[in-house]
Amino acid sequence: MTKLIIHLVSDSSVQTAKYAANSAFAQFTSIKPKLYHWPMIRNLELLNEVLSKIESKHGLVLYTIADQELRKALTKFCYELKIPCISVIGKIIKEISVFSGIEIEKEQNYNYKFDKTYFDTLNAIDYAIRHDDGQMLNELSEADIILIGPSRTSKTPTSVFLAYNGLKAANIPYVYNCPFPDFIEKDIDLLVVGLVINPNRLIEIREARLNLLQINENKSYTDFNIVQKECLEVRKICDQRNWPVIDVSTRSIEETAALIMRIYYNRKNKYNK
């Protein structure tokens, strides 16, 4: 079995490059690819970090990057190292543009339906739904990522977004003065990420939620001191275990998920050395 290193470089989630790689390698039963994922590469600083990794582990590079400056830097680097650097859909886009007479506006996405990646995504979505809000804790070992945080810190939508990118994410709420699941006392080899938020912002979100549900009796849910303690306690739990913490106060769901994916793949790439 021939082993081959593949670097997947993308300004989004690397799923397009991953689809293409899986489909292509399905034609080579004697090749065992080792995939290194480099998602959300959107500036030269991040790209340079990836280039240093590629230099230390030579392999074929597949990329989907819209920014022309980043594309040029990547292809020039690979050319100098004499390693293949392939735009996953660049040839397709160029041919469509030539045939239609319409200039390229931006890089488009595409899918290979019903392949292994497709079904992995479905399984990840199913997992996220079944393990939402602290459910089925006995199956946490199957997760790629576990999110913890106070109520209304976007754990559920972030879990679903991660699932659409093929990652199994469970989420567990932290409630002040309530026992936290004992999994945190175990030596688990899983990525656990804490989500926190500015207390004032969290109170606004919770008040809007209570108004929507026409609930007026849950005072502790929007009490500043309690909300603040919840966020501080989550930070404390994570700091004690060297788990990363993300402040979602000014981040969209996509931005939060992208940061988590970067942490996840950096961790995975490190363990694959």
UniProtKB/Swiss-Prot annotation:
NCBIfam families per UniProt: PRK05339.1 (NF003742)
Key words of the record: Kinase, Nucleotide-binding, Serine/threonine-protein kinase, Transferase
Top-level taxon in the UniProt lineage: Bacteria
Binding locations of ADP: G149, P150, S151, R152, T153, S154, K155, T156
A Pfam family assignment: Kinase-PPPase
Job description of the protein: Bifunctional serine/threonine kinase and phosphorylase involved in the regulation of the pyruvate, phosphate dikinase (PPDK) by catalyzing its phosphorylation/dephosphorylation.
EC number per UniProt: 2.7.11.32, 2.7.4.27
Any GO molecular function: ADP binding
Protein name: Putative pyruvate, phosphate dikinase regulatory protein
The reaction(s) this protein catalyses: N(tele)-phospho-L-histidyl/L-threonyl-[pyruvate, phosphate dikinase] + ADP = N(tele)-phospho-L-histidyl/O-phospho-L-threonyl-[pyruvate, phosphate dikinase] + AMP + H(+); N(tele)-phospho-L-histidyl/O-phospho-L-threonyl-[pyruvate, phosphate dikinase] + phosphate + H(+) = N(tele)-phospho-L-histidyl/L-threonyl-[pyruvate, phosphate dikinase] + diphosphate
Family: Belongs to the pyruvate, phosphate/water dikinase regulatory protein family. PDRP subfamily.
UniProt cross-references to PANTHER family, sorted A to Z: PYRUVATE, PHOSPHATE DIKINASE REGULATORY PROTEIN 1, CHLOROPLASTIC
Keyword Nucleotide-binding: yes
